[in-house]
Swiss-Prot record:
The gene coding this protein: SMIM44
UniProt keyword terms in alphabetical order: Membrane, Transmembrane, Transmembrane helix
Region Disordered: start-end pairs: 104-149
The UniProt record lists the keyword ATP-binding: no
Residues passing through the membrane, by range: 36-56
Membrane topology: Single-pass membrane protein
Main location: membrane
Name of the molecule in the record: Small integral membrane protein 44
Domain of life (superkingdom): Eukaryota
Length: 149
């Protein structure tokens, strides 16, 4: 067996000097960055992408509003319906509901009968009532009356 080991070593050995004694492979990355910098850049990219996905429509609306402010609205947007007020605080919402229903009923009457205005004025709105109904205060039942005597 010692002869076989000597033959295997002899195959890899050569009397000439090695060709690539000081060979260094080229770097795989064109930009040398530490790993933590690369991870920080990727994390920042993910955060920006998620933030844009969340508020992208808001940014788009803001850009359209700025363009409308700077250049004026498009000609086809002149007849567009106006937006509602952002807050209805202090408004009687039940009264507004009644007015809307009466206006809608008036449009149906005007469309069907051909009249311009309804024949009778709308009834006055009912007085406001609380939307929560409370029961009468509890009274002593007959069971307690029997127990007291």
């Amino acid at each position: 067996m010692p002869g076989l080991a000597a033959e295997g070593e002899a195959e890899g050995w050569s009397p000439s000097p090695p060709l690539y004694e000081e060979y260094r492979p080229p770097p795989l990355d064109s930009i040398r960055l530490p790993r933590y910098v690369l991870y920080l850049l990727l994390a920042a990219l993910v955060v920006v992408a998620v933030a844009y996905a969340i508020v992208g429509h808001l940014i788009k609306d803001l850009a359209h509003d700025l363009a409308d402010w700077a250049f004026g609205p498009k000609p086809d947007q002149e007849a567009a319906p106006r937006e509602l007020r952002p807050s209805l605080t202090g408004e009687d919402l039940e009264g507004l509901d009644l007015q809307l229903a009466l206006a809608w009923q008036g449009e149906e009457d005007a469309g069907g009968g051909g009249e311009g205005a309804p024949s009778e004025p709308p009834p006055p709105p009912e007085p406001r009532r609380p939307s929560i109904a409370f029961k009468d205060p509890p009274s002593r039942s007959s069971f307690w009356k029997l127990m007291a005597t």
